Amino acid sequence: MNRWQWSEEIIEAAELDLSLFPEVRSSIDVIGEITNEAARETGLLAGTPVICGGGDGSCAGVGVGCVAPGTAYNYLGSSSWVALTVEKPIVDEQRRTMNWAHVVPGMLHPSGTMQAAGSSYNWMTLQHYFL
């Protein structure tokens, strides 16, 4: 994550070919434009730039203003996570957290997640612990 490129060591260990992987791009990079065919099918204007974009977690972070180093947020839906915005990866030796690329260039979102958060909240509601 420090070099913003695929790990050749991991790719070789998995016995894969680096040429199978796409170029690593920033979320704000223009990667193409709407073609005439896509414009006809979608109603979008031909030539409209297509931006690389980002994943749901880091886009949610932008939505709540978590864009500067040291800011954090908590997401609660079907799953739940707490994420922080940082410039360098935070490595948890026990692997309880992971680092995601932020949509803000050069930033990362180390986060910890619970995959059954929504179900847990629903169970508590059904047990009448919440009114």
Where are these regions (language model features)?
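Short linear loop/turn motifs
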Residues: 22-30
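Active-site core segments that coordinate phosphate-bearing ligands/cofactors
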Residues: 1-15, 30, 36-131
